[in-house]
Regions:
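Walker B catalytic acidic pair
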Residues: 138, 144-146, 156
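Active-site phosphate-binding and catalytic loops of NTP-dependent enzymes
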Residues: 57, 80-83, 95-100, 129, ...
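Peripheral, non-AAA+ core regions of ATP-driven protein-machinery
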Residues: 1-50, 54-55, 63, 67, ...
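Conserved alpha-helical scaffold flanking the Walker A/P-loop in AAA+ ATPase domains
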Residues: 46, 108, 119-141, 174
Length: 371
């Protein structure tokens, strides 16, 4: 199994035209009441699961970020394909984690402790065993209380998030393991946890808050598409159920598996081909790109998330509301534009009659700066 990279690295997603999308049926049923007042957070996690996008949830202690993440993501992540399952089985075999009663197709949800070392996360040791990032392949690596992890561990994630693999070297031998995972982060907004709280006073200085967030680094946060501040809004009457979210995700995953690649894994050329915009959408992207000084990676994140939103609605074409919601989700968690609120009626807005054009201005930058 260790002879070559090809023993592990397989196509991003097995093309499936007729196979039904299934979810983990062994989990206990979820009480939809936990979503009351958390429509925005549920929507963010729904989109993250539908496109396998990396996500960051920020909020004060007790706001529900960990509960919602650990409850919804395992329930909303579709089961693996046969090919994905085979890759995971090989990894688990080398880690000594296989057993006769394990569900072969359930996507992994790994939640390492905050004291995890680089070796524990990346893998290594005498026999070059796979680490958490490899064990989470085709599933989710969730880091609760992210700020408590060592800075070196967090920075180590940057390369695997790009390459989808990790190379371990020991005693003159190199071993390549896959590390194709969805990254989920959850953290307090500051050391005391009350920054941006509407009901509590933050006791942290500006310097301590800056030092707190320096641990994450801009390059790491740039690789996280969805960023959301969690707070319970008792006045928000919008409702959504887990079954409705699964239906939306099933629609999106089917489109992506037929295409052969998940939206979060699209490369610059694929983004330019799939994310064709009409004049209204192009003008909107031009405006926010210039106004917010967006980098090519920021633009790519918005386009990938907007494509996922369109796919959840059964569409391949991106509409203006898809871009607005994606821009809201991809913005800095403390600098949200707060100009768009998703509702089922506004998502029906029809601008499909306009001619779709390949994205301009951005594709050349993608190829140069993201390749």
């Amino acid at each position: 199994l260790l002879k070559s990279k090809e023993n592990f690295i397989s196509p991003e997603v097995q093309t499936q035209n007729n196979k039904k999308i299934r979810f983990n049926e062994t989990l206990p049923s979820i009480d939809n009441s936990i979503l009351d007042g958390h429509f925005e957070t549920a929507r963010a996690l729904e989109i993250a699961a539908a496109g396998k996008h990396n996500f960051l949830l920020v909020g004060p202690p007790g706001c529900g970020k960990t509960l919602l993440s650990t409850t919804l993501i395992p329930a909303l992540t579709p089961n693996m394909t046969e090919e994905e399952s085979n890759v995971n089985y090989r990894i688990k075999s080398l880690a000594g984690l296989t057993g006769p009663h394990q569900d072969k197709y359930t996507a992994p949800f790994r939640m390492p402790h905050q004291t995890a070392s680089i070796e524990g996360m990346c893998g290594g040791g005498v026999n070059c065993r796979p680490g958490e990032i490899s064990l989470a392949t085709n599933g989710t690596l969730f880091l609760d209380e992210t700020a408590e992890f060592r800075s070196s561990v967090l920075q180590m994630l940057r390369v695997p998030l790009e390459s989808k693999s990790v190379t371990l070297s020991r005693a003159g031998r190199s071993t390549v393991y896959p590390a194709n995972f969805q990254l989920g982060l959850a953290t307090n907004p500051c050391p005391c946890g009350n920054f941006h709280s509407e009901s509590r006073v933050c006791l942290c200085s500006a310097k301590s808050i800056e030092q707190y967030w320096n641990k994450f680094s801009a390059p790491l946060l740039d690789r996280v598409e969805i960023k959301h501040f969690v707070k319970k809004d008792t006045e928000d009457t919008r409702k959504i159920t887990v079954d409705e979210m699964k239906s939306h995700i099933e629609t999106a995953i089917k489109i992506q598996r037929e295409r052969g690649v998940y939206n979060s894994k699209l490369n610059p050329l694929e983004i330019a081909e799939l994310c064709k915009l009409n004049k209204t959408c192009q003008k909107y992207m031009d405006t926010i790109t210039q106004k917010n000084d967006l980098s090519p990676r920021n633009v790519a994140n918005i386009l990938k998330v907007s494509l996922t939103i369109a796919n959840m609605d059964g569409r391949e074409k991106i509409r203006i509301n898809d871009l607005k919601e994606a821009n809201e989700l991809c913005s800095n968690v403390f600098e949200k534009p707060n100009q768009y609120k998703y509702n089922f009626e506004s998502s029906i807005e029809n601008d499909e009659n306009e001619v779709q054009e390949p994205i301009r201005l951005y594709s050349a930058k993608y190829q140069k700066e993201l390749s």
